[in-house]
Amino acid sequence: MSDYKNTLNLPETGFPMRGDLAKREPGMLQRWYEQDLYGMIRTAKKGKKSFILHDGPPYANGSIHIGHSVNKILKDIIIKSKGMSGFDSPYIPGWDCHGLPIELKVEQLYGKPGEKLTAAEFRIKCREYAAEQVEGQKKDFIRLGVLGDWDRPYLTMDFKTEANIIRALGKIISNGHLLKGAKPVHWCTDCRSSLAEAEVEYYDKTSPSIDVAFHAVDAAAVATKFGVTRFNGPVSLVIWTTTPWTLPANRAISLHPEFAYQLVQVEGQCLILAAELVESVMKRAGITHWEVLGSCKGADLELMRFEHPFMGFDVPAIMGEHVTLDAGTGAVHTAGGHGPDDFVISQKYGLEIANPVGPNGCYLTGTHPLLDGKFVFKANDLIVDLLREKDALLHVEKLVHSYPCCWRHKTPIIFRATPQWFISMDQKGLRKQSLEEIKGVQWIPEWGQARIETMVANRPDWCISRQRTWGVPMSLFVHKDTEQLHPRSVELMEEVAKRVEQDGIQAWWDLDAADILGADAADYVKVPDTLDVWFDSGSTHSSVVDVRPEFNGHGADMYLEGSDQHRGWFMSSLMISTAMKGKAPYKEVLTHGFTVDGQGRKMSKSIGNTISPQDVMNKLGGDILRLWVASTDYTGEIAVSDEILKRSADSYRRIRNTARFLLANLNGFEPSTDCVAPEEMVVLDRWAVGRALAAQQDIEKAYANYDFHEVVQRLMQFCSVEMGSFYLDIIKDRQYTAKSDSVARRSCQTALFHIAEALVRWMAPIMSFTADEIWAFLPGKRAQYVFTEEWYDGLFGLAEGEGMNDSFWAELLKVRGEVNKVLEQARADKRLGGSLEAAVTLYADSELAERLNSLQDELRFVLLTSGARVAPLADAPADAQAAELVKGLKIAFSTAEGEKCPRCWHYTTDIGLVAEHADLCGRCVVNVAGDGEKRKFA
């Protein structure tokens, strides 16, 4: 028997079967950098329509975590897919570099400013530390395969950006949105600074829950409001609070004007309570006997006076719509210095806004002899004892409730009225305008719109001033006596900005006011406050996007961050852009969920369920991480575990194997000379190219809609079902056994070439490393990198009018599936070896039979059997198996007649008819020694 191996077109490629990504990817990154791949993309896309995804800056502190990876990979997928879609989409990564976390790290290393280092030296150390952190994070982001201008990122501590942040505030001032006031703000006693809403987290805290009696100054006068003239003991208005430490600042008691209140006689005293809450108050106070003496509306008690239990003065009853009946007594202890609602109602009544608490959370001297110098939370028990001593404590118990805490220290914070600078929400209609702007933005997912609308509608004025060392200075001058802003503030801020642009923020602290104020310097002082870091990042639409030349003044199309940024970066950016320019800074806002483990639990070092992106890349490679991100519905929680990543690795292998099959069978194919014209191609090959066209249309749409999990699903379906389970199986015989330069083989290679050209582009935004690797093995002249290209435009499909159209092949795919079931069962029963040992008879109704017969002798190649014939359904024997998914079809098989051809492995009766090739079948003789077999359909 002759060895016919050399007459076969066996697959061959240098493209490795194993990805070995963890080892191979770093070398690819090095090549991308050395050859300036990002610059090549910019050159290739120059002049195209712009799409700008503006990078929300991560904080320059610590290593990146899995959530960072999700964020950056999603951005990179969008940027690359937009490039494939014909957009010029530059990506400028950024970092948030000022603020408290960096200060705290530098304090740990060098001490607080003014101790071992001057404030100026401290800022230098902060700048150096932030720069180190940026470099560390940058390496990890690059390792993810994210392409961007990594050599020229934007940093909020860049001198020019710092200057532009000052200019942004100047514009807001000129538009009339800045105000100064002593308002209660979130205050961290550890930071000794105010906090933004986005810097507040909520944790469970145990607090004393107390009911406190404020005795009426004129009990008889108050009782008459209830129509009561006879009562026993003092008359007291009862408040409920979980913050006893705020009682020294109490200046009023708020009642709802429309609620019904009752005067309730208990043993030895009368209590005023909301009618609906009497029973619940009595129950928790352990009072079993009481009598309702009379009722009145809250409005009837307005300005009645009640004695403060321990401060030695009396306070009025005032009316407030913020009072509810959800809990408590229906009377709200009101301290304007310790709560936003209290502040508003106190201002309305012209009450003192008392603030007896210092920056460190301790009572100021002169507050109360027992409390002076005490830390507020430690004073709670002292105040409870004081109330008990004054016979003003009706009830006390411990309550576990959700309480605001500092995002950095995780410690409880307080509301504290301090002189601060605010962006006013209503002074010049900023709230109303922002709500209008929200409507013009596309929110992905849609629920994001309602979420941010609620936040904007209910948010207080934005406190933008901070009492910190490492931050952009507000750069304001105020009059020594009136504390009013200098009338030329905006002009002066531009002078400061010019200096900061040259020398950084230290220029402000080095500035002698006389240098720019002249004679006015005697009457004005520099404001020492720095800006909230959310102002830094929130103004990057102006300080970065508007000034970077590669953006061409286009403005941002998209912001993309985690869902916590509705109250963070999305909010601050919207406020600043609307205050500056009267419009939103973005056209689309996409949010993703947080990462959780396989059981849906939050990632936590204490639980031990964290997954490090660095570990994943070192073990599995960046493309596995990228494929996992793309495979997930990012709009909800994003689950990750070793098992989930293993599934992503399995999916990756299926896609890689498909690509390798394509490349291996393009061996010896030169597109410029070997491509077969569509009209001359085998019908099945044209169908395969048409399936690629349909897949590409779906994939392009999914990319455009940011449905990346749909991209992956469609990619997997194409590779596994349409290609792997059908087309690639069928063509092996023709590809391997046909004459190497025959139309039958070149038609197949033409299809594989078109499919590979499309597939590598579909993969590129997600599996970037592997796409680059595939690109290098594709035949024909081409650009150096797939990332400079657009979606492949060489695909074509079957004409709908053709008899063998898409519907025909879809039906045939089902028929083949039914045949496979029958043959697989026979193999399981040991009645059959390989499918080529079988000859199949398809008993079909007349319409199906006509379609199947149109394939003539080539039906057997589609079914991967040595024989196939079609017979009338009525002739089906009893043992023929009815198809489950194809109507009018029964299947039977028998062992194929003849001998096995050693070259094509088909069983046939025509072996040995040609003496020179006595062991070959007639078909193989034609392919080895003749003109090659002709294929028309498959």
Swiss-Prot record:
IleRS has two distinct active sites: one for aminoacylation and one for editing. The misactivated valine is translocated from the active site to the editing site, which sterically excludes the correctly activated isoleucine. The single editing site contains two valyl binding pockets, one specific for each substrate (Val-AMP or Val-tRNA(Ile)). Monomer. The keyword Amino-acid biosynthesis does not apply. GO terms for cellular component: cytosol. A motif ('KMSKS' region) lies at residues 602-606. It comes from Serratia proteamaculans (strain 568). This is Isoleucine--tRNA ligase. Its cofactor is Zn(2+). ATP binds at residue 605. It is found in: Cytoplasm. The gene is ileS. Gene3D superfamilies: 1.10.730.20, HUPs, Valyl/Leucyl/Isoleucyl-tRNA synthetase, editing domain. Zn(2+) binds at residues 901, 904, 921, 924. PANTHER family: ISOLEUCINE--TRNA LIGASE, MITOCHONDRIAL, SOLEUCYL-TRNA SYNTHETASE. InterPro entries: aa-tRNA-synth_I_CS, aa-tRNA-synth_Ia, Anticodon_Ile_BEm, Ile-tRNA-ligase, Ile-tRNA-ligase_type1, Ile-tRNA_ligase, M/V/L/I-tRNA-synth_anticd-bd, Rossmann-like_a/b/a_fold.
